[in-house]
Amino acid sequence: MEITKQSIIGDILDREPETAQFFFAIGMHCLGCPASRGESVEQACAVHGTDADALVAQINAFLASKN
């Protein structure tokens, strides 16, 4: 699975639950909330003041290291 800024957080977490650590790290502690699960990575990063490209790169590097 490759993550993009348009990827929906709920979809990411359903397929790769270990990625929750990256969302927690940016202060997104409401991962179970329906609203946050429907947000794109880009939307969540905007709300939490985080660079979406950097977060996407971190998550994709993590996922690549698993394979």
Where are these regions (language model features)?
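Domain-level signature for proteins that mediate thiol-based redox and metal-cofactor handling
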Residues: 1-67
